[in-house]
Amino acid sequence: MVLLAGTANRRELAVERAAKKEAVESLNGLFQTTSVAIVAHYSGLTVAQMQKLRQQMKQAGASVKVSKNRLAKIALEGTDVAAIGPLLKGPTVIATSSDPVAAPKVAVEFAKANEKFVILGGSMGTTVLNVDGVKALASLPSLDELRAKLVGLVQAPATKIAQVTTAPAAKLARVVQAYASKSEAA
């Protein structure tokens, strides 16, 4: 009987190890592809508040992960955002996004509305960010907004060039029209 109980425990441990290994691989894949990672304490938030945070992150193109800190630290090894490892103490949540502004912007806005959500810091690539760094990053325009501004800047000179090249022809047409009107009047 004791042997059977021991065998069941070994199977459970093997399944648990496999699940942990899968979680580490999944997190590592996420950390490999992200450009920014934000760490925050979420102790005291309700399930509804966490769902709202996840929804806001998803709408912004970011994601939120809650995992065991030990597993997250293992998954961080060899990634650009590995510097956030020391921040993983206590009940932490990790927000990530490929847009360097999306996750920080949502996290800062959520922290303003929920005092129990406390931003600890983060990482943008290999650059470590403190709380002020995360807030500064959140104040920047998003990648899409920057692209729109860049397109506007590129299009503006083209529009001006078109106006300059058509202006002499328009002036010439007005001179000819005035001369024709003057000839008809005389």
From Swiss-Prot:
GO BP, one annotated term: translation
Pfam families given in the database record: Ribosomal_L10
Query: Quick check: keyword Metal-binding in the entry?
Result: no
What superkingdom does the record give? Answer: Bacteria
What UniProt keywords are attached to this protein's entry?
A: Ribonucleoprotein, Ribosomal protein, RNA-binding, rRNA-binding
This protein's GO cellular component annotations are: large ribosomal subunit
Which cysteines does the record link by disulfide bonds?
none
Tell me its family: Belongs to the universal ribosomal protein uL10 family.
Q: What role does it play? A: Forms part of the ribosomal stalk, playing a central role in the interaction of the ribosome with GTP-bound translation factors.
Quaternary structure, per UniProt, is: Part of the ribosomal stalk of the 50S ribosomal subunit. The N-terminus interacts with L11 and the large rRNA to form the base of the stalk. The C-terminus forms an elongated spine to which L12 dimers bind in a sequential fashion forming a multimeric L10(L12)X complex.
Please identify the protein, giving its name as recorded: Large ribosomal subunit protein uL10
Q: Which organism is it from?
A: Rhodopseudomonas palustris (strain ATCC BAA-98 / CGA009)
